[in-house]
Design a protein with these regions (language model features):
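Bacterial N-terminal signal peptides
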Residues: 6-15
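Positively charged n-region of N-terminal signal peptides that target proteins for export
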Residues: 1-5
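Extracellular glycan-recognition regions
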Residues: 21-205
């Protein structure tokens, strides 16, 4: 009997095509030893951020969206030409205690925050905002998907399993778009550090 080798060769022939179909990564930063290229700090406090054990840690300082400290920004991909997913894993290394203490992804237009996908402490409990979906886990992976005029906000509890959609809606195009990872509304006089891991921007179909 002839050995069944044909399917094996078919799979070999298909492998390059399968690899080519993977969504292309536009930018990736593991925060391994240093920050990747083209990041810029907004209101940097050098004493309140660090690269530690293969991740970026930022101390959650008091403040609001309009005066956040140590926000890390970079130019957003051109969503008029394609759709993109922005992902990062965040971990509260200490339980948040302050009302509206939060960390996550913020979208900027012309230097102003216009949208956020965050893990936020509200009335003693932790939620995903927008959507206010309960999220008691200390670690979540965030995914903000953007098209030319819309967004879809998702997260993975414990950075595992399927992504859950918490909200979707319109995100009108604007000038000078940037994407940021940041945290704010921290307690005064107490160090709460948030860890950011595996930041990635990739093109999606």
């Amino acid at each position: 009997m002839r050995p069944l080798v044909y399917p094996f060769f078919v799979l070999l022939a298909m492998a390059p095509a399968l690899r080519a179909a993977d969504p292309p990564v536009v930018f990736e930063d593991k925060f391994d030893k240093t920050l990747g290229s083209d990041w810029a700090w907004l209101r940097e406090n050098p004493k309140a951020w660090r690269i530690r054990e293969g991740g970026l840690e930022i101390c959650v300082e008091p403040g609001l969206a309009n005066n956040v400290k140590n926000a890390l920004l970079r130019s957003a991909p051109d969503r008029s030409k394609a759709s993109y997913a922005i992902e990062v894993t965040i971990t509260f290394t200490a339980p948040p205690t302050n009302q509206y203490e939060q960390a996550g992804i913020t979208w900027y237009q012309k230097g102003n925050p216009v949208f956020k996908l965050v893990h936020e402490h509200i009335d003693g409990k932790d939620y995903m905002i927008p959507g206010k979906l309960p999220a008691p886990e200390k670690t979540v992976r965030l995914r903000l998907m953007v098209t030319k005029d819309k967004y879809t906000a998702q997260f993975q509890p414990d950075a595992k399993g399927e992504f859950k959609t918490v909200a979707s809606g319109n995100l009108a195009p604007g000038d000078e778009e940037q994407v940021s990872i940041q945290c704010y509304n921290g307690p005064a006089g107490v160090e709460h550090w948030v860890r950011f891991d595996d930041f990635r921007i990739r093109e999606v179909k």
